[in-house]
Amino acid sequence: MARGKDARVTVILECTNCVRGGVTKESTGISRYITEKNRHNTPGQLELKKFCPYCYKQTIHGEIKK
């Protein structure tokens, strides 16, 4: 039987390039992905390289608070 909090949590990844650069007329929004991470294996914030359709390239997507 599991004790305490669940190990797997749902996190939201947001494009750091869109957030830093600001939303311009060329980019109509901010790219976000929803994924899961294991809290015990990765206690820090998760950063993955994902494709951003607004930047038209692969950028680093960082974990944000819900």
Curated annotation (Swiss-Prot):
Location relative to the cell: Plastid, Chloroplast
InterPro entries with a match to the protein in the record: Ribosomal_bL33 (IPR001705), Ribosomal_bL33_CS (IPR018264), Ribosomal_bL33_sf (IPR038584), Ribosomal_zn-bd (IPR011332)
GO molecular function: structural constituent of ribosome
GO BP annotations, alphabetical order: translation
UniProt keyword Transmembrane helix, yes or no: no
Disulfide bridge map: none
Matches recorded under PROSITE patterns: RIBOSOMAL_L33 (PS00582)
Main location: plastid
Gene Ontology cellular component list: chloroplast; ribonucleoprotein complex; ribosome
Keywords noted in UniProt: Chloroplast, Plastid, Ribonucleoprotein, Ribosomal protein
Pfam families in the cross-refs: Ribosomal_L33 (PF00471)
NCBIfam families documented for this protein: PRK00504.1, PRK00595.1, rpmG_bact
Family: Belongs to the bacterial ribosomal protein bL33 family.
PANTHER family, sorted: 50S RIBOSOMAL PROTEIN L33, CHLOROPLASTIC, LARGE RIBOSOMAL SUBUNIT PROTEIN BL33C
Protein name: Large ribosomal subunit protein bL33c
Organism phylogeny: Eukaryota, Viridiplantae, Streptophyta, Embryophyta, Tracheophyta
